[in-house]
Amino acid sequence: MLLLLFKRKPDLKKFLHLLGFCLLILLGLVALAGALFGYFIYSPEPALPQLSGTLTKGAIEVGGLKRTYLTYVPRGLPQGAPLVLVMHGSGEHAAEIRIGTGYGFERLADEHGFAVVYPNAYTFDWNDCSKVGDFSVNGAEVDDVGFLNVLVDKLMAEISVDRGRVFATGVSAGGFMSIRLALEAPSRFRAVAAVAANVPTPENFKCTPAGQGTSVMIMNGTDDPLVPFAGGEVNLLGLFYKGGNVRSSRESGQYFADRNQLTGTPDTKSTAVADGVSVEQVLWHKAAKNMAANSTAANNTDANDSGTRAEVELVAIHGGGHGLPQAYWRRPRLLGPSPMTPDGPAVIWAFSHDSDPEPGCVNDGVR
């Protein structure tokens, strides 16, 4: 019987039909994968704007590790100009956050006269306040706070930025790192803006907050599929990038308001900025009588002394997803809705630059 099977001639025609069918299935799967990638993940890069300044690469050694960064300095930047740190998300680098912000901070730097630095994380992620995550190299946690402090000192010496006007912001993992700076290095940063990030819950919290505070903005989308606006576990589709539990965005704002001793009722303003998109601003600040009583200390950045600068603002993008809204680049659909307004970089700069902003409305992203 076996000999008969081996002697039987193969049916070449059937074999070719089967092979063709398999190839069609394979091509269909490839086409489907390409379509899914194009729809959910691919997003064309924005055009590089005409900028006045120069972008340079830099490196320093901190804690035995080589740390790298990009610096943008506008043409004719005067001495004593502000400095803005912009931190990237997980698995990204400085080049990606430039794209992710639509080069918005460099556009603003040209207009308002400040320097921008984009530091790179050493590992896959920034070593933020979350306990969940891989932040170790050779058995020791990476000291990202130390790196950023050394970087600021280096830039102060090289481009003569104003020590009293250093601001920090970041998106996603960079936003979580911004929260750590606000807690552990508040005296070094006049204001901090965390985007697509919330304060970790107590069981997922490892930071040691300093005694004083600084102004903090939290900007989150209500439809963020990765960092839940209402609080809960940080993850993507329940499968990827699990980062532990976080507080809600409102609770995160209240957390910093309590730290900054802002006990009054916050001011709230809601503004429609596009079809299906509205911006809710919740601003915690000192009561008018306390501000008047401390008017002689208006230049003091310590929240426990005057509080005139230690405000807290939650910017809730209703109808927004995971990332910083701006007009020049749409984020991948996998990260949720990507509204082109408000102008996130402009909102952050207005909050950071204004030492004691009054409650206001969002007008195309500018307070």
Spans of model-derived segments:
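The feature captures the conserved acid-bearing segment of alpha/beta-hydrolase catalytic domains
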Residues: 190-274, 284-288
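A short acidic, glycine-rich active-site loop
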Residues: 136-142, 238-247, 335-339
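Mobile gating loops/cap/lid regions near enzyme active sites that modulate substrate access
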Residues: 280-286, 308-324, 328-330
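The conserved beta1-alpha1 loop
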Residues: 85-89, 196, 220-221, 318
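A domain-start/cap signature at the N-terminus of enzymes
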Residues: 2-83, 108-111, 140, 169-193, ...
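Serine-hydrolase catalytic machinery in alpha/beta-hydrolase-like enzymes
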Residues: 60-73, 79-167, 176-180, 184, ...
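C-terminal/domain-terminus segments
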Residues: 318, 327-344, 365-367
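Non-transmembrane alpha-helical segments in soluble domains
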Residues: 106, 149-152, 253-257, 349, ...
